[in-house]
Design a protein with these regions (language model features):
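N-terminal metal-binding scaffold of metallo-dependent hydrolase/deaminase domains
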Residues: 1-66, 78
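C-terminal cap of metal-dependent C-N hydrolases
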Residues: 35, 421-481
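Active-site gating loops and adjacent loop-to-helix segments of metal-dependent hydrolytic enzymes
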Residues: 95-123, 149, 181-212, 276-301, ...
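Alpha-helical scaffold segments that flank or form the walls of functional sites
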Residues: 98-170, 217-234, 485-487
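His/Asp/Glu-enriched, well-ordered alpha-helical/loop segment
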Residues: 296-303, 345-433
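C-terminal regulatory/interaction regions
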Residues: 478-482, 486, 499-532
Length: 532
């Protein structure tokens, strides 16, 4: 057997009854978080996978003795971890790549209309390369690209899902929907009435093209998509629901979503209180906090994940904890768009499951999930000798088990234990620890503090190697990037020109809309500076 980058074998021999089986070996196998401070770790360990399912975890010598003749993937230079889960993701080419720099969310959402139109399949492959290359094996794809009419939505969904399946990733796919307040946090007609006549007519015409009947969503999109992917293609796909947020969804739509989730036994991902303007919207519209309103209409429940949840009060957190809701923390996005910092430590203290998402892109304008773990570790530290920051074990759980549960794969992935699917990542531990690392530093601390996407050696999903030696095994990355470049190396299409002109015209009016939306001086959960 030829040794390649420290790997022995190429992905599986024949196990019992001719099954595809292999041993995945590492100096350490990090199985799961026992608690907030400890991980289950096997030293010089291995994972036995048979037909994509983990059959055993234990000492390598013992498993090799019991199962002679199997290919061994990995060696003592590696550490084996569960595949990471990105619980909040939208696009491939980043907004910056498409001409939109960071700005507050309420302006940035409108500026996104400036972007070039990118083929959905190729665009998804682009981000999938980056995700897999940083150890992500499953993703919650929240698709905001809704072509008109509704009948075109399944084709869009199929293209995105096909990209993930072709590259070998797990995906929970949701098409984001909305039915009100589509440009600002006020009724469309009310905002249009403030615009100059010509721009008002253009805005009304543009909004009319995005209208759909709520009942059509279930019959024309949701049910066909669930039928197309239920149990198919190695069971790598889930179809999820994503009402975009409280501000842009009527109570009718939110409650319909709740009914659809119950009827089809699927989950919901809702963008929630991302900015202080969204916090103010709920107070102005309902006379109470956003979470209190969702509670009062019966929306909250264990099938719901709230994305962001930056501007939550102490009472809000009590309601979230009592409702068995999950939260997805998007640290990079909240910093880049000046949204704030979610009180993640308070969530954890209250026992609320927190997952992690990179959103559109991380701080480096890429999808390095390992860097995102490090950011979360350092972001939630307050000054002082007696502050207790998040532990490495807590962050590890967020990026694995909690993420898996949030996107509908909780019974299948998120930990390394018998019965789970073999979604595994081999990191080059020699590179992470070079030239020296004191033995007092645990493997998970070494990963959180030092690992980068360049340390990802091999990624296995469902027992199949999808990334090795710095490249994906199923799709040629260079060829795909060339195709993307060629597709955009053309003059702007008339529709793109019209959208850009519309953005330039409407943008000042959107900015002016929020001029008197002033947030009272907040009392933060933990302070990082003081004026005096």
């Amino acid at each position: 057997v030829t040794e390649r980058s420290g790997l022995v074998g190429t992905g599986g021999g024949k196990g019992p009854s001719g099954a595809n089986a292999s041993l995945i070996r590492g100096r350490y196998v990090l199985c799961k978080a026992h608690n907030d401070h400890e991980l289950a770790v096997v030293q010089d360990g291995a994972v036995l996978q048979v037909d994509g399912r983990i059959e055993a975890v234990g000492a390598y010598d013992e498993l090799a003795r019991r199962h002679p003749g199997l290919d061994t993937i990995g060696c003592l230079r590696h550490v084996v971890i569960p595949g990471l889960v990105n619980t909040h993701h939208h696009v491939g080419l980043t907004p910056v790549q498409l001409g939109i720099t960071d700005m507050p969310l309420e302006l940035w959402l409108s500026a996104r209309l400036y972007a070039r139109q990118v083929d959905g399949y190729l665009d998804t492959l682009y981000s999938a390369f980056e995700l897999i290359g940083s150890g992500v094996t499953a993703v919650q794809h929240l698709d905001t690209m809704r072509p008109a009419p509704v009948s075109a939505w399944p084709e869009r969904g199929h293209a995105v899902i096909k990209a993930y399946l072709d590259i070998g990733m797990r995906v929970s796919y949701a098409l984001c929907i909305r039915d009100q307040n589509r440009l600002v946090y006020a009724p469309d007609e009310q905002f249009i009435a403030t615009l100059p006549p010509a721009l008002a007519r253009e805005t009304a015409d543009w909004l009319s093209k995005t209208h759909f009947r709520l009942e059509d969503y279930e019959t024309d999109f949701l049910e066909p998509m669930i039928g197309a992917y239920s149990g198919g293609r190695e069971n790598l796909t889930r179809i999820w629901l994503a009402p975009i947020n409280l501000e842009r969804c009527s109570d009718e739509l939110l409650l319909l979503t709740k009914q659809w989730a119950a009827r089809h036994k699927i989950g919901i991902h809702l963008h929630f209180c991302e900015t202080h303007y969204q916090k103010l919207y709920a107070e102005r519209r309902f006379g109470k906090t956003a979470i209190r309103h969702l509670h009062d209409i019966g929306f909250l429940g264990p099938e719901v994940t709230l994305g962001h949840a930056v501007w939550t009060t102490e009472d809000d957190i009590d309601l979230i904890a009592a409702s068995d809701v999950r939260i997805c923390h998007n640290a990079s996005s909240n910093l880049r768009l000046r949204s704030g910092i979610a009180p993640v430590r308070r969530f954890v203290e209250r026992g609320i499951p927190v997952a992690l998402g990179i959103d559109e892109a991380g701080l480096n304008d890429d999808r390095d999930m390992l860097q995102e773990l490090r950011l979360v570790k350092h972001l939630h530290c307050a000054p002082g000798l007696y502050d207790e920051p998040l532990t490495a074990a807590q962050i590890f759980r967020m990026a694995t088990e909690n993420g898996a549960r949030s996107i509908g794969f909780g019974d299948e992935i998120g930990s390394i234990e018998p019965g789970k699917r073999a979604d595994l990542v081999l990191l080059d531990y020699d590179r992470i620890t070079a030239p020296y690392l004191d033995p007092a530093i645990s493997p998970i601390d070494a990963i959180i503090y030092r690992a980068r996407n360049t340390d990802v050696d091999t990624v296995m999903i469902d027992g199949k190697i999808v990334f090795q030696d710095g490249r994906t095994t199923r799709i040629d990355r260079s060829e795909t990037l060339d195709r993307i470049a060629r597709s955009l190396d053309v003059p702007l299409q008339p529709e793109e020109v019209a959208r850009r002109r519309f953005v330039h015209a409407i943008f000042p009016h959107i900015r002016d809309f929020y001029v008197d939306w002033t947030l009272p001086k907040p009392e933060p959960f933990y302070a990082v500076h003081a004026m005096r």
